[in-house]
């Protein structure tokens, strides 16, 4: 069984061994069903949405002969944090239906939009009295940084041909609000809210708050490589204006293991700035620790950099609270075009931790420049 990712299972199949694929990244059903963990029943951490379950390809990069060694897929629902049958059912459903399609659908038939728009298992769940998550009926929002415009572009989808209306000021969308007809360009701080108005049914809602700083929407380049499991959208996650919740698998955090964070942001050279703040995450039970230091550099040509600020971070203690840490550094006002932020990983996991001496993860999110 390949639990910690897919690499072990793929390697085993290539060596001629039979494999069951059950990677935690896609099939741990004790992970939250939504990145909005505060609105979900309690879970062990992480996030596995139903569309992420569906997206898994257990036979990727294998020849037909090697594919024969993939016996199937399996989901795991560890019950340390499952308090009742209702809680267990909620964590299973409807992700179990998505898992079934991963197992049984031929590649030519498997299609997320078909599955989402044709999903009717909720009727059976209700008839049987099961408790289940309803995120498949919700609004799926995704966004990307447009460095040419210095903006964030929001894209929305939902089940079926249902009208979506949105606002940018945090007010509740109504049928009189602008109707979503295509990607929405956001060029300044906004409280984006959207509602899918379902006739005779429960409306779906989506919200995302963007807090723009002078770095938001700017071109950014990673000079070091994040861990393959936690690369997601890359450097743009650091300059998208969204301050993520403390869920490291939500797709809004970059995770580093073998290298430090080293990112260069093109500030354009048109406006001055004098402070930088970096957001990081600590989840000691998942081997995620604060950085050991954060350093800021500036340059006019993108080649020759000068250090302007740094902060040393004490080694984490067992009693330190997990969650988001913010490291803010001030320096003499500059209009240097290029800004570099380097966050060093802790040298090793502290002696008090079960993973003592091993490498810990460094997770980073927004870089705020003012």
Q: What is each PLM-predicted segment?
A:
Residues 1-164, 213-225, 233-235:
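Substrate-binding groove of N-acetylhexosamine-processing glycoside hydrolases
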Residues 4, 158-160, 188, 267-269, ...:
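Short loop/turn positions at the edges of beta-strands in beta-sheet-rich folds
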Residues 16, 68-72, 151, 181, ...:
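Active-site lining segments that contact anionic ligands and/or coordinate catalytic metals
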Residues 96, 202-204, 351-357:
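Beta-sandwich strand segments
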Residues 110-264, 281, 290:
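Short, compositionally stereotyped local motifs that mark structural "simplifiers"
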Residues 170-179, 308-322:
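Solvent-exposed beta-strand/loop surfaces of large extracellular or lumenal domains
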Residues 245-309, 313, 323-370:
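Aromatic, loop-rich ligand-recognition surfaces of beta-strand-rich domains
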């Amino acid at each position: 069984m390949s639990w910690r990712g897919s690499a072990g299972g793929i390697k085993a199949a290539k060596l001629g061994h039979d494999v069951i694929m059950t990677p935690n990244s896609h099939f741990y059903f004790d992970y939250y069903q939504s990145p909005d963990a505060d609105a979900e029943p309690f879970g062990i951490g992480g996030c596995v949405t139903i569309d992420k379950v569906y997206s898994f390809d257990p036979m990727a990069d294998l020849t037909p002969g090697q594919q024969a060694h993939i016996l199937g897929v399996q989901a795991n629902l560890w019950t340390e944090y499952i308090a009742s049958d209702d809680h267990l059912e909620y964590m299973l459903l409807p992700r179990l239906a998505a898992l079934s399609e991963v197992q049984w659908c031929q590649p030519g038939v498997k299609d997320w939009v078909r599955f989402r728009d044709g999903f009717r298992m909720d009727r059976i769940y209700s008839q049987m009295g099961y408790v289940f998550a309803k995120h498949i009926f919700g609004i799926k929002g995704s966004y990307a940084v447009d460095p040419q415009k210095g903006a964030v572009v929001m894209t929305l989808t939902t089940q079926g041909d249902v009208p979506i209306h949105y606002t940018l000021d945090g007010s509740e969308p109504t049928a009189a609000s602008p109707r979503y007809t295509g990607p929405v360009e956001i060029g300044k701080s906004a409280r984006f809210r959207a509602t899918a108005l379902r006739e005779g049914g429960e409306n779906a809602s989506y919200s995302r708050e963007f807090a723009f700083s002078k770095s938001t929407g700017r071109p950014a380049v990673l000079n070091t490589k994040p861990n393959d499991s936690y690369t997601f959208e890359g450097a743009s996650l650091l300059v998208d204006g969204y301050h993520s919740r403390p869920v490291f698998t939500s797709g809004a955090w970059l995770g580093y293991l073998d290298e430090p964070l080293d990112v260069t942001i093109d500030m354009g050279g048109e406006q001055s700035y004098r402070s930088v703040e970096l957001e990081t995450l600590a989840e000691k039970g998942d081997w995620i620790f604060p950085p050991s230091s954060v350093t800021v550099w500036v340059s006019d040509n993108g080649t020759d950099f000068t250090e302007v600020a740094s902060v040393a971070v004490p080694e984490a203690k067992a009693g330190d609270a997990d969650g988001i840490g913010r490291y803010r550094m001030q320096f003499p006002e500059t209009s240097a075009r290029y800004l570099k932020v380097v966050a060093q990983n802790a040298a090793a996991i502290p002696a008090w931790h079960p993973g003592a001496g091993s490498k810990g993860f460094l997770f980073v999110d927004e870089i705020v420049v003012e």
